[in-house]
């Protein structure tokens, strides 16, 4: 049957020269058959195709393969409608039949080929078995031959021994072919027939003896030299052992000193932590007592105010005011709850960041200690590692102190309640409101306004787009200089090496561009001239008046030109002249802006808060919450003390806040790690509580009165060294200068905008 393999069929083409599986032979013999098989529709209807596919029943397929392949479908009609079969379906079925027939032919062909290959495999297997038998026979004969060869060799060896024993009875002359029975005859023959050989032999023997004597002398000298070398080697080994012992003792003493120093530092650190914890607890108790007293007074005032509103004539007017006050209190409580959750989240983030930095510093410390144990022979490397360990431990202690100060600030700000003022609606309040707002706007207008238009004219979108580009270029330059990304500080040795590298690059660029200094001077003069002309034309104060005031900052271009002109001696004189100024407390007048190197310390100007609306929730991280823009009756300004000093304050996601993030390292530098941040916050809060407040007519004072006056702010001026004016760091200085200037000007614009 077609498609089935019968093993009994002869396979005659297996030994032919032409391969039996060639396509030419296959297609010459293959022809499509006619379709004459009948269709058993009943049997086909009882067939379960899904079961056949699921069980892979090949026998059922083998039964139906001939019927499906060679059936005629042209005359078949539908049993229901007796209509002819669709021609397209007939074509499809015929193509499937032809494909199946071709596949059956391929199956038969492959089956025949498989049978031939099996026969050839059997023949090859029989040949291999015959070869194995022959090989076994050959191996057996080889073993017998080897044994015979071994016996023959033994026989030949015994015969050679016998022949050599018989030949030793004769003494053959070395110079001719004669042999003698006795050795005396041989010597007489040599002396008689070969006299020249005997003289040469004597001379040779004499020379050999002389050479042997010289060799003996040389051996004696070599022995003495080896003994001396051994003695010297022993002395050298002893000296090396002594040096190693001394080095080991020195390293042991240094390690003990390092351990003692680490123990002392750890003890000091624990003592400082305990002192700071005690200080924080004491200050938190004081703040809690103050807040409780303020809340008690607030409740008393609220009770008094509520008692005044119980009159029958004002009953109708007090209902909307009461609802408004309740709404404000509810909004304030919700806002305080949000604040607490945000502070708690930031506190956890700061703790995680601190733990990660602590782990990094510990891993760096362990790596340095391992390097210290490996490099035992170099005392200089040990000193360098000790310096690095000291710097890392100091950084770790500073980080811990900063984290502690942040925790205390978070606790204080979360524990401090925000007072709510009970305000009565009177005609006098509404009439006094514009007067107070005008007074505030006049007080805020005392701030320098010559920086504010610059920020108003600026494009925030352009600033947002240029900021990541500048930051990326700065990070690339720092990485090219050898500083890894995320580095928060460098050691003195790294600073010295980078300074020498920058000095060399600066000198090289200066040699490449000889006209750099003249171009710089000309640009400086041109910029100064244009600034003076613009200031004169606009009526703004000139740099001379700013210099006389001593508080307003010049433009970044003027600062850069001044830095380019100053040399190292001038910077030293400026530092010496400014050091006594930094120690004296100087008042900060309203009409002068703080310099860019100072940490701005903004005090509360007015205790008036607007109604809490959604428009004013974006200013939680700034120093001021702006006053109301509407025509409401009264307003109280809430001041968050220490918000400028707190680096983990909630971001406002504005351009001004993005510029404030760049000034955080300066704030960290100005903060004293011994808890001075907490003390500064406490003093500022006490000053705010003790500052006299102007209340509108009909308003109620919610804070206790105090007779203390605010202390003058201590201004810390930082001197810039003249060595930072190189061309490589110019982009860094411009970037930091612009951001610092933008930060200060944005703060000025914000304070002036609150009064508008």
Swiss-Prot record:
Skewed-composition ranges (Polar residues)? 534-558
Q: Does the keyword Cell inner membrane apply?
A: no
Name the InterPro entries for this protein: DZIP1_N, DZIP_RILPL, Znf_C2H2_type
Which residues form the C2H2-type zinc fingers? Answer: 171-194
Assign the protein's first listed, main location to one coarse class: cytoplasm
One of the Pfam families matching this protein, by short name: Dzip-like_N
Q: Pro residues: which segments have biased composition?
A: 586-598
Q: Which residue intervals are annotated with compositional bias (Low complexity) in the record? A: 10-19
Can you name a GO cellular component term? ciliary basal body
Q: Where in the cell is it found?
A: Cytoplasm, Cytoskeleton, Cilium basal body; Cytoplasm, Cytoskeleton, Microtubule organizing center, Centrosome, Centriole
- Per the record, the coiled-coil ranges are 108-158, 196-283, 321-416
Q: What ranges does the record give for the region Disordered, renumbered to this chain?
A: 1-20, 193-212, 233-262, 310-365, 409-466, 531-626, 693-756
GO biological-process terms attached to the record: cilium assembly; regulation of protein localization
Q: Which GO terms describe its molecular function?
A: zinc ion binding
Q: What's the domain of life for this entry?
A: Eukaryota
Compositionally biased tracts (Basic and acidic residues):
193-202, 237-262, 319-335, 344-365, 560-578
Keywords associated with the record: Cell projection, Cilium, Coiled coil, Cytoplasm, Cytoskeleton, Metal-binding, Zinc, Zinc-finger
What name is this protein filed under?
A: Cilium assembly protein DZIP1L
Provenance organism: Danio rerio (Zebrafish)
UniProt lists the gene as dzip1l
